[in-house]
Amino acid sequence: MQAVQQEIAQALKVQPPFADAAALEAEVARRVAFIKDCLANARLKTLVLGISGGVDSLTAALLAQRAINELRAETGDKAYTFIAVRLPYQVQHDEHDAQACLEVIKADEVHTVDIAPAVRALAAEVAALKNGSPTLVDFVVGNVKARTRMVAQYTIAGARAGLVIGTDHAAEAVMGFFTKFGDGACDLAPLSGLVKNQVRAIARSFGAPESLVEKVPTADLEDLEPGKPDEASHGVTYAQIDAFLHGQPVDQAAFDIIVATYRKTQHKRELPFAP
């Protein structure tokens, strides 16, 4: 492991690879307990999470629903609730995957909010977008979509006295692959410190189908490049990112991309600048 790999892994609190099935189950139990502790400390009984159809939100939701199920069983209090939220922009091209996720999760409640009217209304009122290039406007509006989704989740959480769950994990965090104050905003992040293959392993341990576990990850925020794979945006694969974070050798080109991207996106992982 090179020094910079160790530095980054420590900063992101990267967890070691699962040694065996028992280690995986122990990590699942630890993260479920973490979610339960967050609710207890906040003195709240509701969790809210947006479901995209990808493995990250699927895995976070499975952990959340298990935590809620355990709390109800332990306390006899039926007020404990997990709310899964669908947040499509008009018609989502992989809606079938989102619905398949919901079937696996078996959430207590499912809410649906079409974010398109809010996103379009805001974009239409922002003068700074009027003269931007199509590519720039598409990118900026893509971030508006992510932030609008989080606004919707916090609106539901506010109405129901709940906490919002985020889906960030180490493989996305190292690349800064999230929208600041969008999907990067949450009250608790139960996948934090995991690499991508660990997220998949946890989903698999819950019995999630391989079609969802191994689905090609995509943020799917930009209209000009619908369904663009995360790895195309990264310039490296998740396998390379995972290997880097676990201190394993990666080719020099991938190494350089990961380190440069980590440094460039440092501001996204920190609190706002202050004097």
UniProtKB/Swiss-Prot annotation:
Keywords (A to Z) from UniProt: ATP-binding, Ligase, Magnesium, Metal-binding, NAD, Nucleotide-binding
Listed EC numbers: 6.3.1.5
GO MF assignments: ATP binding; glutaminase activity; metal ion binding; NAD+ synthase (glutamine-hydrolyzing) activity; NAD+ synthase activity
One protein family per Pfam: NAD_synthase
Disulfide bonds: none
Highest taxon listed in the record's lineage: Bacteria
CDD domains the UniProt entry points to: NAD_synthase
Catalytic activity, as annotated: deamido-NAD(+) + NH4(+) + ATP = AMP + diphosphate + NAD(+) + H(+)
Positions with a binding annotation for ATP: G50, I51, S52, G53, G54, V55, D56, S57, T167, K196, T218
Protein residues bound to Mg(2+): D56, E172
Listed GO biological process terms: NAD biosynthetic process
SUPFAM superfamilies for the chain: Adenine nucleotide alpha hydrolases-like (SSF52402)
Positions with a binding annotation for deamido-NAD(+): R147, K180, D187, H267, K268
Biological or metabolic pathway of the protein: Cofactor biosynthesis; NAD(+) biosynthesis; NAD(+) from deamido-NAD(+) (ammonia route): step 1/1
Signal peptide start and end residues: none
One Gene Ontology CC term in the entry: cytoplasm
InterPro entries: NAD/GMP_synthase (IPR022310), NAD_synthase (IPR003694), NH(3)-dep_NAD(+)_synth (IPR022926), Rossmann-like_a/b/a_fold (IPR014729)
NCBIfam families (UniProt xref): nadE, PRK00768.1
Quaternary structure and partners: Homodimer.
Protein family membership: Belongs to the NAD synthetase family.
Function summary: Catalyzes the ATP-dependent amidation of deamido-NAD to form NAD. Uses ammonia as a nitrogen source.
Protein name: NH(3)-dependent NAD(+) synthetase
Organism of derivation: Pseudomonas putida (strain ATCC 47054 / DSM 6125 / CFBP 8728 / NCIMB 11950 / KT2440)
